Amino acid sequence: VTAEAREAGLSQDPAADGERPLDIALLTYKGNPFCGGQGVYVRHLSRELARLGHRVEVIGSQPYPVLDEGAEYAGRLTLTELPSLDLYRQPDPFRTPGRGEYRDWVDALEVATMWTGGFPEPLTFSLRARRHLRARRGHFDVVHDNQTLGYGLLGDVGAPLVTTIHHPITVDRQLELDAAESRRRRLSVRRWYAFTRMQKRVARRLPSVLTVSGTSRAEIVDHLGVQQDRIHVVHIGADTDLFSPDPAVRQIPGRIVTTSSADVPLKGLVFLVEALAKVRAEHPDAHLVVVGKRPEEGPVAQAMERYGLEGAVEFVKGISDAELVDLVRSAQVACVPSLYEGFSLPAAEAMATGTPLVATTGGAIPEVAGRDGETCLAVPPGEPGALAAALSRLLGDAELRDRLGAAGRDRVLRNFTWAKAAEGTVSRYREAIADSAGDGPRRSPAGTPRSAPLPPGPSAQGAPGAQGAQGAPARGTGTPPGPEAAQADGPAGVTRTVRDSEAVHMTEAAS
């Protein structure tokens, strides 16, 4: 682009929709795909937005997002690290930072909230993000928040705000409370999920909300009180190039595969373990492979011991994308036993590989998996007997497996791809920008490239980096109680831009 074109606010090439490319700030307080579905969302959506010709800057905290590389969008996808104190990193979660690690009052707030049993990251990330965005006013056409829902994002963040809410975390909170067996545990759950009060207040003031399913839309209205006309459904999906059938991968007789991002009631893993015990009476070779971390205690560990299934249940974590896909391909059946999901990426990804699916009807899972007997076998949530019957039926019927597997992949290709998700998201970006046009100019002239990044601020003395890994690539979208940490470093070729500038006054975050 020539200097004259820059001055005129012109862009060299239009985006895929024929309009001017957008400069997008995509915020995520926990963006690593090894941590949960929010990281998967950021990884794939950012890539597809860049493929459409837009410039995407992902702004995230530890464990840092993993972004994809691609020659066709080189230079249009960057990562900005906005470091926290990384209090939940492995192998020392709930750690107390050293004196030299504290940089400002937000750090002190983060530690104080953890010490009192709360989960600070949505609030503290939002405060740091607000400070960062205000320092870079005029750089972005739109700010897209990936379910931070923190006080720091209320008011003017320098560009129109669009927010994704995958599902209300209040659903997770209620399921945790229902499963709590003691008063002490219930008190702990309430304290951990105290941030949901903030999220309710923030959600009600948001101008534009994206969500991933009609079920989530209804839950957001009911649980968070958001006006329905502010909520837009944009389905997400599977990477159908990666998750695809491969006849060269041998299916293992009796293999059932599932994904469990955390040992929490919402995922329903304990019911699948109980179902496996019943299935093995009819199919002795039936065994379960769980993509996730093995629980050392709790209901799942107790069920495995009670039914003598230690040798029939395997947990795998930290595997690559290719290894994950081959694992799903090798299974005769994939299973989603969740009590509730706002979408269910595991269902879409399993179906995309052509692996037949048994899934519950919890939450939005039927929107993804389709009708019972047509694209999956569907069972009520929380019923191990029904799960066992469906699993046994599929394990014993090769023709049914083939039919459901083919129909499932066709359903995903028609409805649930990341390319479609990106196109729908851009449409909502442009609507938000148009709706805010009456508020006065928010950025530099259209098409003007972003100015050079701010110089990096001084690194915090002894500031920790994200370490360790908790689980394999996980596909849930909630924030389960307890520490989550994952490998922080993405591909070496991904550009890392400016860290939070210390030149920005701390008081801006609270103003």
Locations of regions flagged by a protein language model:
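A conserved catalytic-core segment of Leloir-type glycosyltransferases
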Residues: 2, 14-21, 59-127
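Conserved acidic donor-binding segment of nucleotide-sugar-dependent glycosyltransferases
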Residues: 371-372, 376-384, 393-398
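Acceptor-binding helix/loop patch of EC 2.4 sugar-transfer enzymes
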Residues: 92-117, 157-200
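Conserved donor-binding/catalytic core segment of Leloir-type glycosyltransferases
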Residues: 249-276
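Nucleotide-activated donor-binding/catalytic signature segment of Leloir-type glycosyltransferases, i.e.
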Residues: 298-319
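Aromatic "clamp/platform" in nucleotide-sugar-dependent glycosyltransferases that forms part
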Residues: 339
